[in-house]
Amino acid sequence: MAEAQQVADSRVADLVRAGKVRVALFLPQYAKDPVTGERRVDVHLMETARALAMRLGVELQILEYPTPSKVMEGLNAGTCDVAFMGNESSRAGEVGFSSPVFELDYTYLVPAGSSIRRIADADRPGIRIAVVRNHASTLTLSRLLKHAELVYAETPDPTFDLLRTGRADAWASVGFVLQAYSARLPGSRVLEDRYGANLLAMAVAKSHAGRLAYISEFVEEAKASGVVQQAIERGGLRGLHVAPPANPGAQK
């Protein structure tokens, strides 16, 4: 996959004709510098998106959305072509998913002095856990908790503010996202254990079955060839792994 591959493939002929693939990202897959406004995209996503564009032989265009729900709307409206998204059963009726590309650990960020040391410590009456509404990490946690209360915000920054201002006792999300925010809250800790993992796949509109088949092939090729592992290494993030192959028996 080191060289561009011009594709004479009917499954993605529309993308080749357009000369670009529009990859949608949602917060916190990208961030804006508050001073310069410069966009920073998670390296592992950017590198994998570039590899897809190279395989297609087209330009890569990154589009910004605030939430996963807005990305799904964009996919089905045709305003974007592909996205990276956790393959949750609640989303499967709206978009089509490739096999997983990445596996991302879910855990908690807790403030200085917190008595929460392990995941199990947080599931108690009276404990408030901040979450981003409709994120895969939230959907997973909502199925696991028996006693703690979820406190919702729409995007990562206001979710962090719930923790920072004492309106929540922990924040549940992807580990490397929490690591970045931890630097903004002195004494805070990201727990070492996890309550699950995000199997991050590539998503397309349900109406594009051919495109999905093509992208699923790309994903398996990228995992097997080391492209995904190299993208992870370039990003240097903790708690991020290459997802297992979709068909382990086919790997040599």
Question: Where on the chain are the PLM-derived regions?
Answer:
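Short helix-initiation/N-cap motifs at beta->coil->alpha
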Residues: M46, Q61-E73, R117, V151-T165, ...
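Extracytoplasmic small-molecule ligand-binding "clamshell" domains
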Residues: E3-G86, R91, S225, R234
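Ligand-binding clefts/hinges and TM-proximal coupling segments of bilobed small-molecule sensing domains
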Residues: A2-Q6, R11, A136-A153, V190-L191, ...
